[in-house]
A protein has these predicted regions:
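Terminal targeting signals and extreme-terminal segments of soluble enzymes
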Residues: 1-163
Length: 163
């Protein structure tokens, strides 16, 4: 993978675009620490509407954990794709990926106010990506793990280019 400065600038710009999305803002989520093939999605302060996991007002709902994983692993994939040489001439917002499968194992109750989902790419090609991650509470306790598969869609001009 090409990890030169221009690609890192493009990754940073795309990250800002994700942080400006209405969905992430409404949920109080932020894509933070990013590197090629890695990402962290943080929930600095859980909202009352995000609680209720296991029937308790103190536990984060599993749905919140799921969409945080989807964002962290998905963003890790986007950052890897943007670092590929064939991505150097495309608009980063034209590159798409969709979740095929997201498998989550819940290990501990997610209790507290702030949480983070960490994602990293395990394997990636032009059409398919595999990623995994961990979900941690403010004390660093791993509350859940995830692994998933994503389908990658390049802009038509790139998709038709010989490999």
């Amino acid at each position: 993978m090409n990890t030169n400065a221009p690609n890192l600038d493009r990754i940073a710009a795309c990250k800002q675009g994700w942080n400006d999305s209405p969905f992430l803002k409404a949920q109080g989520l932020e894509v933070e620490e990013t590197a090629v093939g890695r990402a962290v999605v943080r929930l600095p302060k859980a909202l009352p509407t995000q609680r209720g996991g296991g029937g308790s007002d103190t536990v984060l709902n599993g749905g919140v954990i799921s969409y945080m994983f989807d964002g962290a692993l998905g963003w890790a994939i986007i950052s890897s794709l943007l670092a590929m040489p064939e991505a150097s001439d495309i608009d980063p917002f034209e590159l798409r990926q969709f979740t095929i499968n997201l498998d989550i194992t819940f290990l501990n109750a997610a209790v507290g106010d702030s949480f983070e989902a960490r994602g990293k790419v395990v394997r990636i090609s032009r059409t398919t990506a595999f990623a995994e991650g961990e979900f941690l509470d403010a004390n660093g306790t791993v509350c859940a793990t995830a692994k998933g598969i994503w389908r990658v869609f390049w802009p038509r001009s790139i998709a038709s280019t010989p490999r």
